[in-house]
């Protein structure tokens, strides 16, 4: 997901074909930074990656990872205070579920969590940090 999100950002923010930029070279640069598994030189993944240019995803593919950050961080409060802690559940209901789209999502998250989102819980969930 990180590779896809970075590729999406680079294409929408920096990609300049009129200045000689090439899609496969752009992806290769990103893969050097973050890829875990090498891909074959004959691969043409970008030619079929329609998400980044269709369906409202333009420069928004990162949202999959961002959703994981928010979900893991919110759940970590339950882990810290007890999965079945009534007060934690009520706070989640009051500050997230019952508010829906009536307020800015980040304001609701910060009200529930008491702080800005942090990556630690997601990294731990992925087994990257322990």
Predicted regions and their residues:
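C-terminal, non-catalytic "cap/extension" segments appended to globular domains
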Residues: 1-130
């Amino acid at each position: 997901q990180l590779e896809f999100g970075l590729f999406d950002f680079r294409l929408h923010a920096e990609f300049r074909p009129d200045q000689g930029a090439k899609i496969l070279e752009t992806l290769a640069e990103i893969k050097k930074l973050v890829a875990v598994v090498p891909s074959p030189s004959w691969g043409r993944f970008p030619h079929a990656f329609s998400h980044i240019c269709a369906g409202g995803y333009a420069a928004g593919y990162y949202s999959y990872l961002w959703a994981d950050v928010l979900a893991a961080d919110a759940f970590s409060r339950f882990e810290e205070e007890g999965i079945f802690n009534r007060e934690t559940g009520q706070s989640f209901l009051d500050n997230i579920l019952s508010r829906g789209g009536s307020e800015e999502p980040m304001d609701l998250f910060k009200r529930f969590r008491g702080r800005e989102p942090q990556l630690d819980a997601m990294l731990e969930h992925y087994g990257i940090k322990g």
